[in-house]
Design a protein with these regions (language model features):
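C-terminal functional modules
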Residues: 1-30
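Conserved beta-strand/loop scaffold segments within soluble protein domains that form the structured core
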Residues: 27-289, 293-296, 307-311
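Beta-strand segments within the central parallel beta-sheet cores of soluble alpha/beta enzyme folds
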Residues: 302-306
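Sequence-level preference for short, compositionally simple segments enriched
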Residues: 1-4, 290, 300
């Protein structure tokens, strides 16, 4: 069975259908290790990809004013137990353009493997980028994933990101994102992670509200069980009049798991405001009792509550 087919068959684990790779109206990239297995572009979109021994290097550019009708699927992964992957990508969204990127990171058999991603994203004036990233690391806990991204949100532009790793084991995950927002720009960063066994999760998301009336939200939901560990840091700085930001972190701890939440808020202008809230604890006892009173077993009730938190 080919590596391309192996990754295709894993797509449903992150909510995608393999058939999207066959649709001529949908742009995509499939990369295995440092090899590009398949790619397709559409009008208004430019994909420049290069295979190198040490990385896949690429640029994704959306023309000014273009509205890409269907999400762009970017599928990267490894279909073997061991290996390494480095992705270096530059994303540029032209002024007044609108695009949705679905990133699928697939490592179904990983026992000792590594994935690194270094990205820069620039969203032009009045443009919009929605970036949805789904991961599946298999059941073995042998994956190390280290994504790093810097994002620039232009004047009046929008950036929405949603990261999820909810099925299988996490392994070791270290996220480091920095977002700069110009005047009237908006950014919302959402992350949802379910840790098991000996998983280690480190999330650091930082936003700098540089322009007047820039707005942001960092929202994180994590459920940790067994002997897993999580350290989640959300940082928001406000530097201009009318800037508004909020950091919202909720972690649920079960078994012998450990979790920490570190909200950091800084304000450098008297007319700016940043708020935060963080909560760490066990499953809500009242919710649990209510569900059990309706006939659910304790395990079913906990599973339902957890699924609601990670929805």
């Amino acid at each position: 069975m080919s590596e391309l087919n192996d990754l295709r068959l894993t797509l449903p684990m992150v909510g995608a259908e393999p058939a999207i790779l066959d649709d001529p109206s949908i742009a995509h990239v499939v990369g295995h290790g440092h090899h590009i297995l398949s790619h397709r572009t559409v009008p208004g979109l430019h994909l420049d990809l290069e295979e190198r021994p040490e990385a896949i290097v690429g640029k994704l550019a959306v023309e000014a004013g273009a509205h890409i009708a269907h999400p762009i699927h970017m599928c990267f992964g490894l279909a073997h137990e061991t290996g390494a992957q480095q992705i270096n990508i530059n994303v540029e969204v032209g002024e007044q353009a609108h695009v949705h990127v679905l990133a699928h990171c697939l490592f179904p058999l990983a026992k000792s493997a590594q994935h690194r991603m270094s990205a820069t994203m620039t969203i032009g004036q009045g443009a919009s980028l929605t970036y949805t990233e789904g991961h599946y690391h298999g059941p073995f806990g042998g994956m190390q994933v280290l994504p790093h991204a810097t994002i620039r949100v232009g004047r009046g532009a929008r950036y929405f990101s949603d990261f999820s790793l909810l099925s299988g084991s996490v392994g070791n995950l270290e996220i480091d994102y920095l977002v700069d927002i110009e005047e009237d720009g908006i950014a919302e960063l959402t992350a949802k992670v379910f840790g098991h066994n000996n998983d280690r999760i480190y999330l650091k998301e930082a936003i700098r509200l540089l322009g007047k009336r820039a707005r942001s939200l960092i929202k994180t939901r994590a459920v940790m069980e067994d002997a897993s560990r999580a350290e989640i840091t959300g940082i928001t700085e406000a530097h201009a009049a009318g800037a508004r930001g909020h950091v919202d972190c909720m972690e649920v701890v079960q078994g012998q798991a450990h979790a920490s939440a570190i909200p950091i808020v800084r304000v450098f202008h008297p007319e700016a405001k940043v708020t935060h809230e963080a909560a760490i604890g066990s499953v809500d006892k009242h919710e649990l009792e209510t569900l059990m009173a309706r006939g659910l077993a304790p395990e079913q009730a906990v599973e339902l509550i957890v699924s609601g938190i990670l929805r």
